């Protein structure tokens, strides 16, 4: 089953189609970005071409996803998670022990350069950056709301994550899994931010010309794999390489499984062959995994050419997740029947509105945007507001055009 069947039962087939389409587009782009990020690390560590690393990861993930299905995805991801976590912890302690002043020097450098600064605010609570500033992505409201909305989208509207909850044999187990996810999300994020801060401090103490070159070229994604390759001892290097491989596999296998199941249930079974055998269903699912793995590899090859794959991934989420959040909120929080066709139109216009307000370049529409935003003191709406704007637009307009049940 998929979560988009709920939209079909709640509103109608077109809303289900829109949810399916938005998910598949978002997941192909976002997972392509993830694949590119992992492949960059492997290409640096093993000194192989980026495209070769992308193909290698895609092939391996395809093989065990095809053979094992969602069960293989969940168990391998669990093992890979602990491996990745161990790699991050080991990296932190290695860097601290390698610095002449140890942890104290790391903390001093991090504090001096603002690496531990959570909020970019002034001492005055009335300062606009403390809460609301549409120009600044570091404003408090932008950060808090972006985090909340993104978490809701990932855990509530994305089949990639929801499929794991759907494997639970009881609702309470699924709810417990969500609570554990929420509880662990913050400390794990802090851990990996700590690794980034530790790398920054390490290269302040031990400058490296190659790292300076990565920074100058805005290729900061290459710094950590360069550190693994040139600084770590052989044993630790092996552990971190295994952790990188774990990250690469876990970022791709669940996406392939989600895309395959969504394609079969929401598209193939409805429009191509409604009546089919279980053997045929398995065959189609496996063929679709091959196709999606190839598409993800192509997307990753294009994403690998960008300056920073991390920010590209965040930007992609913002454009489409807002529309998905909005339509699911109408379905869950209101007693409105909804307008099936109107939902599709509103979701599409949500993406257009977000692009108009947040895109770096919108061609001839640039002047119109300036005319609208300049009186409000806004030059260009920060990318962190994109998912929020999309959600509010879809929910607000959707409620207006819906009827009570």
Model-derived features: positions:
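Membrane-embedded helix-loop-helix hairpins and adjacent transmembrane boundary segments
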Residues: 1-405
């Amino acid at each position: 089953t998929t979560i988009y069947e709920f939209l079909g039962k709640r509103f109608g087939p077109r809303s289900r189609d829109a949810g399916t389409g938005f998910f598949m587009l978002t997941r192909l782009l976002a997972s392509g970005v993830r694949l590119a990020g992992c492949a960059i690390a492997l290409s640096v560590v093993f000194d192989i071409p980026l495209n070769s690393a992308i193909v290698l990861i895609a092939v391996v993930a395809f093989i065990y996803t095809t053979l094992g299905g969602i069960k293989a995805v969940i168990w391998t991801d669990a093992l890979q998670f602990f491996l990745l976590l161990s790699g991050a912890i080991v990296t932190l302690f290695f860097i601290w022990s390698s610095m002449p002043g140890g942890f104290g020097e790391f903390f001093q450098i991090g504090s001096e350069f603002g690496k531990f600064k959570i909020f970019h605010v002034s001492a005055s609570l009335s300062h606009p950056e403390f809460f609301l500033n549409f120009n600044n992505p570091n404003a408090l409201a932008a950060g808090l709301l972006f985090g909340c909305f993104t978490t809701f989208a990932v855990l509530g509207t994305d089949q990639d994550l929801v499929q794991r909850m759907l494997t639970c044999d009881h609702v309470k187990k699924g709810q417990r899994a969500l609570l554990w996810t929420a509880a662990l999300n913050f400390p794990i994020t802090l851990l990996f931010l700590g690794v980034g801060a530790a790398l920054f401090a390490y290269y302040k103490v031990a400058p490296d010309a190659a790292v300076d070159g990565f920074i100058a070229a805005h290729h900061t994604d290459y710094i950590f794999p360069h550190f693994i390759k040139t600084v770590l001892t052989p044993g630790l290097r092996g552990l971190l390489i295994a952790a990188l491989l774990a990250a690469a596999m876990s970022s791709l296998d669940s996406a392939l499984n989600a895309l395959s199941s969504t394609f079969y249930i929401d598209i193939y079974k409805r429009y191509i062959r409604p009546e089919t055998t279980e053997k045929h269903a398995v065959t189609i699912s496996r063929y679709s995994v091959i196709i999606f793995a190839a598409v993800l590899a192509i997307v990753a090859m294009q994403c690998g050419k960008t300056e920073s794959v991390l920010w590209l991934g965040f930007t992609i989420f913002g454009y489409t997740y807002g529309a998905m959040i909005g339509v699911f909120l109408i379905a869950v929080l209101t007693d409105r029947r909804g307008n099936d066709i109107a939902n599709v139109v509103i979701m599409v216009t949500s993406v257009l509105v977000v692009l108009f307000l947040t895109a770096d370049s919108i061609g001839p529409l640039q002047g119109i945007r300036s005319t609208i935003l300049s009186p409000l003191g806004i030059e260009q709406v920060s990318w962190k507001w994109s998912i929020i704007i999309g959600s509010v637009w879809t929910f607000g307009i959707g409620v207006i055009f819906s009827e009570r049940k």
